């Protein structure tokens, strides 16, 4: 069976993250959703277009296009760093998204809150934590199946670049035979200092199998069902940056 090359997203191709300090209207809008949820009535209602027009006037958004996205929340791990954008000083607080394509504004509105409040690995983010948060919005595109298992395995599970590609893995559970899946976004591997083998080992564990991972890797043609690579365009904003821009937009 031929490997799948997914239809390229024109929305993904058009995005250029040119906001200040790697920010964008997407990251601001995601942070704004949680801020408004935890502070009902405190801020005027702003649309993504309001934010783009007032804060990022040169940023182009096609609202008719649909895209895949993930929202990530991180929290300062060192309270002594009052203003700090270094990723190493933040710890994961929630990350959820979708590979399904949906309008960008709706996707951010939905998954900014799901990632903050419904990630089962963490308790819901509380209002008091807002000042320590950093929010990232990762727009995904250029999906490509690089390996497909089955009776006639095809492809190369290592046909991807660290720091450039995210990986989505589907594999057969060695004990139950059920299909398991997990993904890591492109920035995770460099942050964790993983090589490609480490990445697959951690994907297998993330999907819920804590048995003999070496057996799975040594026989990946038997266990791996599909490996998909993809790219992401990430923008981030800290609370300090968000709060300053919110004051600017409401002045």
UniProtKB/Swiss-Prot annotation:
Report any Pfam family annotated for this entry: AMMECR1
The family database entries (PROSITE patterns) matched by this protein are listed as:
AMMECR1 (PS51112)
- According to the record, the signal peptide region is none
What is the protein name stated in its UniProt record?
Uncharacterized protein YOR289W
InterPro entries found in the cross-reference section: AMMECR1, AMMECR1_dom_sf, AMMECR1_domain, AMMECR1_N
Q: Which domain of life is it from?
A: Eukaryota
Residue ranges of the AMMECR1 domain? 21-246
Which species is this UniProt entry from? Saccharomyces cerevisiae (strain ATCC 204508 / S288c)
Q: Mind naming one GO cellular-component term on file for this protein?
A: nucleus
Q: What else is known?
A: Present with 1710 molecules/cell in log phase SD medium.
Identify the taxonomic lineage of the organism of origin. Eukaryota, Fungi, Dikarya, Ascomycota, Saccharomycotina
């Amino acid at each position: 069976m031929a490997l799948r090359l997914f239809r390229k997203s024109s929305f993904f191709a058009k995005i250029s993250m040119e906001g200040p300090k790697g920010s964008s209207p997407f990251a601001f809008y995601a942070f704004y959703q949680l801020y408004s949820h935890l502070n009902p009535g405190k801020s005027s209602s702003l649309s993504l277009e309001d934010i783009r027009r007032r804060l990022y006037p040169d940023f182009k958004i096609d609202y008719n296009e649909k895209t895949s996205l993930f929202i990530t929340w991180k929290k300062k791990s060192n309270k002594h760093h009052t203003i700090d954008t270094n990723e190493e000083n933040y710890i994961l607080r929630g990350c959820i998204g979708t590979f399904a394509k949906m309008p960008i504004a709706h996707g951010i509105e939905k998954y900014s809150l799901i990632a903050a409040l419904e990630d089962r690995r963490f308790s819901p983010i509380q209002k008091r934590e807002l000042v320590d948060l950093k929010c990232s919005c990762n727009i995904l595109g250029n999906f490509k199946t690089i390996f497909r298992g089955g009776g006639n395995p095809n492809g190369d599970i290592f046909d991807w670049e660290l720091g450039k590609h995210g990986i989505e893995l589907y594999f057969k559970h060695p004990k139950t035979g059920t299909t398991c899946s997990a993904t890591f976004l492109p920035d995770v591997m460099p942050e964790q200092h993983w090589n490609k083998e480490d990445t697959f080992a951690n994907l297998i564990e993330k999907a819920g199998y804590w048995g003999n991972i070496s057996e799975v890797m040594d026989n990946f043609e038997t266990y791996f069902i599909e490996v998909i690579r993809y790219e992401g365009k990430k923008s981030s904003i800290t609370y300090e940056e968000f709060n300053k821009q919110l004051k600017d937009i409401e002045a």
